[in-house]
Amino acid sequence: MIPTKRAHRLVAVLAVPALLLTAACGNGDSGNGDSGDGDGATASWPVATVTGDMGEEPEVTVEEDAERAEETRVDVLVQGDGPEVSDGDFLRTGLLVRSPDAEQEDLVNTWRPMVADPEGGEEQEDSGPVYAALRVNVDDLLPPAATEPLIGVNEGSRVVVQGSAVELIGDIATQLGFEEGDSVVFVYDVVTVIDAQGRVEGEQAPVEEGMPEVEAEGTEPAEITIPEGEDPPQELRSQVLIEGDGPEVEAGTQLIAQYTGAAWSDGEVFDSSWSRDAAAKFGIGVGQVIQGWDEVLVGSNVGDRVLLVIPPDKGYGASEGHDLQEETLVFVVDILDAV
């Protein structure tokens, strides 16, 4: 569980802009510690001992006289056999972060998620585990130094990273109450590796009458051709061009997706994740994106390619002064995962 104010501060601080998440010190050296190729392996040095099966909440114990880490230590407790994690990949992962210098409290524990009390009172523990969606070696949910040791690890692995809090968390460690010489322990269950430059796979269906044509392949933005002489539809329209077989997208999840957006009036691309060399990650169904996306993408499936035509009132119509305020928008969205 996350019982303390420090844990709440970690969530709050890690939500600030990426500029504040830059690690103060570079990457640490990896240790050669105990590695396992099955469930129930153990890592111990010199701060924490971690035990437990992949997929179950890890047990982390710290002896009172344990030495504090001076170098970053990386242990693969359970060796997976899936794809390797590459620099910049997205991960679906179980995550536990503990400060052994503060009564062994958990700063983050996705095996014991917290939810708001509907009565408006204190938070209550939820009934089941969740996963974190994070990007490796990039300012994201965690600072780069905390995830860089996962590069080269295989999907399906349980990994323990422990070391200096200042080095792994960065300058914000002091905001969280850490002092020089304090340690921090991360336990990752790497459930899914998502290629940040990937596309969904499958045969694309012909577009419906009156919908833009779409060509999407490689690592370039999709080519969107507006039907000649057609007025834009007045209502929100969408079509699944490639049907995925993954889980249904639920409101409140973090969507990891590639997308290209073009204006109906001239067909010009105004935004694309491909221009940033990585998929985008955002909350869906919670008002973080335009209304048309929330309405269509909730209920889609992971692996879908979705074509959306969005009228101004469900696009940027409410954003006064926006360049696209009066524009009908066309998007092609590849849903890579929903965490």
Go through each PLM region and give its residues.
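Cross-family detector of peptidyl-prolyl cis-trans isomerase
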Residues: I2-V339
